[in-house]
Amino acid sequence: MKRREFIRTAGVIAAGTAVARDLVLGRDLLPGILLSDKKPNIVFILADDLGIGEVSCYGADNYMTPHIDQLARGGTRFTHAYTPSLCGPSRATILTGRYLFRTGATNQDSTGRMKPSVETMMPNILKPAGYITAAIGKWGQLPLDPADFGFDYYLKFTGSGIYWNTQAKGKTYLVNGEEKVLHDKEYMPDVMHQHVIDFITKHRDKPFYLYYSMSHVHTEILPTPDSTPDSKDNYADNITYMDKLVGKLIAELDRLKLRENTLIVFFGDNGTANGKADRATIGGRRLAGAKGSMLEGGSLEPLIVNWPGVAPAGKVNHDMVDSTDFVPTFAEVAGAKLPRNKVLDGHSFTAQIHGEKGKPREHIFIQLAGMWYVRDAAWKLNQAGELFDMSNAPFEEKLVAADTKDPAAIAARKRLQAALDQLNPAGGIKDDGDGTGRHANRKNKE
């Protein structure tokens, strides 16, 4: 039996089915799926402030990403993958599989209030299934360490966009609680990469989950080790270097003979930053919005999955995916059990990774601060009751008149409003911030 056929037929119970309902049953767990006699490694690569307009396999006009493109050619590229448009809230959904009105991580500051006694993150789901886990890189706005949320090994730095020790927050970093000095001429992305390689080399005989949160391409944009003295485009240099590191990781997995048993997922934490969005064009067109907005340019992300012998090569998938979906997907892939004491909003897309139809989402949900929307393949409805025609997305979002007589628009409003009513974000944890998603109300900040 071929490996892909064995994996597909060995499933018992679909752990990744959406469980968006209260299941307050202590710490009981849902059964997972035993996918293989040798559990696959999971490598999750999270780029910072990278939108689809900066990845060449998505049609970017001004940037080339050959190694990321190679991942797409050898796997599946998703065209409708969404996440909250700022890094802290985005990472909260990625690691918990829960929407922001449930966790309270509705703005950057409030993300830091998440507690391991309340929220179960990905490592504590995978470890009982036999996985060793690591978080290497940016650790969002969380004041607690990755170890507090279950990671066995971690490297973290303070702030965002750390590259050289000339930066105010670039002097030191932490490895498993021990402070390390970033020395002169050491490049933080290279330091992180070496820790990635050391981790996978040390644990190559045991299934591992790697949460690799890159510095690139968050500001402050500085020259890379490969930038020439006369370089006029440090931003493009940074995208190129990020892509180079992805290629080096793939090469190392090949060298260690781990590629055939490793699921690689490449994703972005939010869209392109405002100052860079004008150049992040596709076919000469700028995306609507940018990082921090409630438009496509803020939340539509590159999502590429690659798993030799399992994920079919060169496939493009148009199903809706959002960032809560990684938790149930990785649990299903790992044969792990999902928590039953919390509502989990994610839908597993493991079937799509296998190249099968599966049961795709009908819509995704995105929130930032007190703003939210549901979006399906053609329409979007926000918290203000505004309906948008998304037929020209991601470049244009056309507001539909409230009194429209268009039967399709009327049906879409009814359908999406029912989805919002079922989720009831207004009944969840209220945002206490300044309305932008960037800061909590300073009077209420813990």
Specify the residue positions occupied by each region the protein language model found.
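Formylglycine-dependent sulfatase
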Residues: 2-385, 390-446
